[in-house]
A protein has these predicted regions:
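Active-site-adjacent structural segments surrounding the nucleophilic cysteine of cysteine proteases
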Residues: 1-54
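Cys-His-centered catalytic/binding microenvironment captured across papain-like cysteine peptidases
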Residues: 1-6, 14, 120-146
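Generic hydrophobic/packing signal
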Residues: 24-29, 33, 81, 125, ...
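Conserved active-site-adjacent core of cysteine acyl-enzyme catalytic domains
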Residues: 48-137
């Protein structure tokens, strides 16, 4: 996963993961790859697939519309939730290539399709190459309403 550096407000990315689930206290942790980084399929479609694989979303009906509705509820204020950037998902390009690591600057105000996006740079320790990337931050969501 990633290690948080509080003094720099950055995430040092150690490796990539597409999802991590925490069953305690009804908290779900999910990270979604940016659609543009991995092909033609969009963010919501990828998120729907991710949730379906873990049994959170049943996959019936129109995935995109249902997931948009879920996101709107989570960010709309009707449901109390706690959001923290606790992990990072590098795009498929970085994940498939050894030697890459990254530092992502958390920008909580940046919203893409209703999901916080993290912008950062990646560095290849093998050849010194740098590359910019956009990531969707991991969300730590408490869905328990109050």
């Amino acid at each position: 996963m990633a290690r948080y550096s509080s003094d720099l407000n950055t995430w040092v990315v150690r490796d990539s993961t597409s999802a991590r689930l925490d069953g305690d206290c009804g908290i779900i942790t999910l990270a979604v790859l940016c659609g543009a980084a991995t092909g033609s399929r969009g963010v919501y479609e990828k998120a729907a697939d991710l949730l379906t694989r873990h049994g959170i979303y049943d996959g019936t009906g129109t995935k995109v519309l249902k997931l948009k509705s879920l996101m709107q509820k989570m960010f709309g204020g009707g449901t109390r939730f706690t959001r923290q950037c606790i992990g990072m998902t590098l795009d498929a390009y970085l994940a498939a290539r050894p030697g890459w690591s990254g530092v992502a600057i958390c920008k909580h105000g940046d919203i893409c399709h209703g999901i916080p996006v993290v912008h950062g740079v990646a560095y290849n320790t093998n050849n010194g190459e740098w590359m910019g990337y956009d990531l969707i931050a991991t969300l730590r969501i408490n869905l328990e309403a109050q």
